Regions:
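Intrinsic, low-complexity N-terminal interaction/targeting segments
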Residues: 2-4, 27-28, 78-102, 106, ...
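Short pre-functional
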Residues: 11, 51, 107-121, 223-227
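Basic, Lys/Arg- and aromatic-enriched nucleic-acid-binding interface segment
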Residues: 93-120, 144
């Protein structure tokens, strides 16, 4: 959105704050920010504009503390997670051509997501240092939550990763999974989403009204475990 919209939102914010007896920027509190957010008729633009303003104000010494992280998040309705059956997922995995470099990579990453419920972003960012080959564990700090997580390095996952490493492009990068054309860098999670979508379509799996990204493997595993009574 344009500069005029940003200025309008900022003007409304400062006018509202002034009605709350905050006469100076340093007087602005978390409660003021929350009240202004609730009063806004354009919360989406409000959030981004005011977050930027509060960060800028703190960086320039106009405010003693950066309060940008206290701008409330927009409450969104969460739909029902997409779930694919175990048979559908196994069909997709089995159909991957594992004789190619890209096939070995796709199989290993999707297997990690399907068996361990790892988010696609975490699977794509997996590093060699995350794997303990002796203890047979995968230890990461989840990108979305920042929470540490230790998962078992299942035999089939270990085998799939090793087969990919043997075919992996020569690179000193610490990330395991790379794009296969120079310049090498970690695989984007959007590429993994595309690979699963292609597999679903190629195998004739019904995706009507369903999401098709690799994150669906996480929700599918959770659903499968619940059915089996594993919590």
């Amino acid at each position: 959105y344009d500069v005029r919209t940003r200025l309008r939102i900022l003007s409304l914010f400062l006018s509202f704050i002034e009605t709350q007896n905050a006469k100076k920027l340093e007087d602005i509190s978390i409660n003021h920010i929350a009240a202004a957010f609730e009063a806004s008729t354009d919360q989406n633009h409000f959030r981004s504009t005011i977050r930027e303003f509060l960060s800028f104000a703190a960086e320039n010494g106009w405010m003693p503390t950066n309060l940008s992280c206290f701008v409330p998040k927009i409450r969104r309705h969460r739909g029902v997670p997409t779930v694919y059956s175990t048979d559908d997922i196994e069909t997709c995995l089995a159909s991957i051509d594992r004789t190619t470099q890209s096939g070995k990579r796709t199989y290993a990453e999707l297997l990690i997501c399907a068996r361990l419920g790892l988010r696609n972003t975490d699977a794509c960012e997996l590093k060699f240092s995350d794997i303990d080959w002796v203890k047979k564990t995968i230890s990461i700090v989840q990108m979305k939550t920042g929470i540490p997580l230790v998962l078992p390095l299942l035999p089939e996952i270990e085998d799939a990763i090793n087969r990919y490493i043997a075919a992996r492009p020569q690179s000193d990068l610490s990330f395991i999974f790379l794009r296969h054309k120079a310049p090498y860098y970690p695989l984007r999670n959007s590429t993994l989403d595309y690979e699963l979508q292609k597999l679903l379509e190629e195998n004739g799996i019904n995706t009507d009204g369903k999401k098709k990204g690799a994150h669906t493997l996480r929700s599918s595993l959770a659903s499968s475990l619940l059915k089996e009574g594993i919590h």
